[in-house]
Amino acid sequence: NSKYFHYIHSMKCRIILELLAILFFTGCYNREQISRLDEAEALLQNKPDSALTILQQLKSEGSQAEQARYALLYSEALDKNHIKATNDSLIRRAWEYYKHHPKDLRRQCKTLYYWGKVKLRAGDKPGALRLYLKVEEKLKDTNEPYYAGLLYSQIGEVYYDQMNYSRAYHYFREARNNFRQADNTREETKATLDMAAATFNSKDMEKAMRLYSAALDLADEHKYDKLAKASLTNLASLYVVSGKKQIPHDLLQRIELSARQD
């Protein structure tokens, strides 16, 4: 009996030790996974390629919350690296979790936003618009001008593609105002260019000229060379097609200089 008791006791000890080891290593793995997800998230804005590299080295494992976070970060990283995913299975996985967590409003909105972008790339414009308008409703309860600006830009793009230029202009203007509030001058310049394009297609040449000029001033001030060139090219084209005005001398010089640099 004593031998039997000793055997049972040693078995229990071994099982307990094995369980403790499993728990220890699982805990270490989870902490490592969370740490790597934190690292990827911190890099997403300015170094999206590095963020994507980290995420590609990880697996969608851990708790439901970790798996959802991984799916959202991966979707965001693909988008920021201009990898045009048209399959929504990954972002759907994130939504399956976040839709039950209304207190995590920021991630709910981001999930719906990136899901909308996937739908848009897949050609489902009505589906994308439905998701974007759902995000717009949710964002009313937050103070996230940068993300609101991104959202309004996307909604504007949908309406612009549908040739509804007045609605497109409305949302591009909302985007510009939010980017201005967020102090993101690059995105503000892009949104101003979008407003100008919508205005041009609405046949309001004078207003389009003012907006392209405003975009050019912003791009010059902050040395956004590509945006300055886009503003300049469109402004020159407007002067030509309007037939109303002679191109100002300083603008003509800039156009000639830009043409020579090409």
Spans of features found by a protein language model:
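Sec-dependent N-terminal signal peptides
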Residues: 15-24
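N-terminal leader/targeting signatures
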Residues: 1, 20-21, 168, 175
